Amino acid sequence: MTKEQQLAERIIAAVGGMDNIDSVMNCMTRVRIKVLDENKVDDQELRHIDGVMGVIHDERIQVVVGPGTVNKVANHMAELSGVKLGDPIPHNHNDSEKMDYKSYAADKAKANKEAHKAKQKNGKLNKVLKSIANIFIPLIPAFIGAGLIGGIAAVLSNLMVAGYISGAWITQLITVFNVIKDGMLAYLAIFTGINAAKEFGATPGLGGVIGGTTLLTGIAGKNILMNVFTGEPLQPGQGGIIGVIFAVWILSIVEKRLHKIVPNAIDIIVTPAIALLIVGLLTIFIFMPLAGFVSDSLVSVVNGIISIGGVFSGFIIGASFLPLVMLGLHHIFTPIHIEMINQSGATYLLPIAAMAGAGQVGAALALWVRCKRNTTLRNTLKGALPVGFLGIGEPLIYGVTLPLGRPFLTACIGGGIGGAVIGGIGHIGAKAIGPSGVSLLPLISDNMYLGYIAGLLTAYAGGFVCTYLFGTTKAMRQTDLLGD
């Protein structure tokens, strides 16, 4: 049995066994487990499993195990359950001889009560953030891959212009790399439409069509469509992914309503056609112009804050981003990043936000130096620090800095210092979203690599110094426990 399989089985036992699991899924670093009864979960046992870097209780129990490991653990859990990742796990409650119906009814009432409380706790903002995350998290590997390939093409192009390399085959290679990159970025609206449809309960293919509609691929020459509000020609992609997400949400409402009123015999033919016609017209003439205004204004405001605020804005963004990640609010920036890339070719917000993770790495290095006797902490750092350098910060947040308290605050200060440097230098952007830390370096636009490196090193140093001086307690340094 592999280490990941053992970890999966220990997690299953800690959450109350397979009989208490409704479904299992995962993101880049977390196994997300939906349980039937929260009271059967042994939180302390779960947190102390070797390999578990943190536990977050939300609508699902989120167990942080780190990148790479998470896929193997989640897949083994799904394999043991006999269903695919994300699918509900069947449980047999029909055995009347073994079943106490009175207890089952009481348990069901209790579960419904807890579910109602959870609904009240999870407000509209949380639902919006979760939807944004569910739409874009599956696309992150594609963003990273396409962005890196585009970055290589840009480097080769710069080397050709400078005269360091030459040849027709280099030109062809650059062209091929750009074609691969555009396979993601040029059709992002379609991918977004498909994922949004899955999230909102519409047919994924119809969501993709609505996303593709915003590209206006059927327009050529003089057959232009006009913006009904300004009288100017509509531009392909106007409204960006904000418009696509809103349009697909409307699509889900229209499609569900049509399924209720269209006879079953013609539902599969009539419903898709009518839904596409209604929402397609609304998208072209209403949603695209309005969403275009919203996205343009939003990007202008963010760019203005960064350019005018400079050092101050950089510090605030860099210092506040870790708390936003902790609360799950960082996903709200994903559409902003993408719109900035669509409009100007780069997001100038991401490199500043990336300094938060760098500040945390600096804090972790200080803990490694200061807490030599705390072997539990150092063992956790061994697994969390390498991926922290690569921009994956959740193992450090939930496994190290947040449980300890003080290092989380000093890490935020380090991130703010790095953000101030990036903001002060200015015009440091990223051509794609996804990674941060050292991994973001190939995606930096306009050859501003040295500026980004300066920000990283400053954030590392700031997080290290602040944590070394103010971020530890005597208990942290002298005990073998992860915490005060």
Curated annotation (Swiss-Prot):
Identify the Pfam families for this entry: PTS_EIIB, PTS_EIIC
Parts of the chain that traverse the membrane: 135-155, 160-180, 200-220, 234-254, 274-294, 305-325, 349-369, 384-404, 408-428, 450-470
UniProt-recorded Gene Ontology molecular function terms? kinase activity; protein-N(PI)-phosphohistidine-sugar phosphotransferase activity; protein-phosphocysteine-N-acetylmuramate phosphotransferase system transporter activity
Q: Give the metabolic or biological pathway.
A: Cell wall biogenesis; peptidoglycan recycling
Boundaries of each PTS EIIB type-1 domain copy?
A: 5-87
SUPFAM superfamilies from the UniProt entry: Glucose permease domain IIB
Give the highest taxon in the source lineage: Bacteria
> What does the record give as the active site?
C27 (phosphocysteine intermediate)
Which EC number(s) does UniProt give? 2.7.1.-
Q: Which reaction does it catalyse?
A: N-acetyl-beta-D-muramate-(1->4)-N-acetyl-D-glucosamine(out) + N(pros)-phospho-L-histidyl-[protein] = 6-phospho-N-acetyl-beta-D-muramate-(1->4)-N-acetyl-D-glucosamine(in) + L-histidyl-[protein]
Whether Kinase counts among this entry's keywords is yes
Give the PTS EIIC type-1 domain ranges.
130-484
The terms describing its cellular component in GO are: plasma membrane
Predominant localisation class: membrane
BP-aspect Gene Ontology terms:
peptidoglycan turnover; phosphoenolpyruvate-dependent sugar phosphotransferase system
Q: State the UniProt keywords alphabetically.
A: Cell membrane, Kinase, Membrane, Phosphotransferase system, Sugar transport, Transferase, Transmembrane, Transmembrane helix, Transport
Q: Where in the cell is it found?
A: Cell membrane
- Which function does this protein serve? The phosphoenolpyruvate-dependent sugar phosphotransferase system (sugar PTS), a major carbohydrate active transport system, catalyzes the phosphorylation of incoming sugar substrates concomitantly with their translocation across the cell membrane. This system is involved in the uptake and phosphorylation of MurNAc-GlcNAc, the principle peptidoglycan turnover product of S.aureus, yielding cytoplasmic MurNAc 6P-GlcNAc.
Designated name of the protein: PTS system MurNAc-GlcNAc-specific EIIBC component
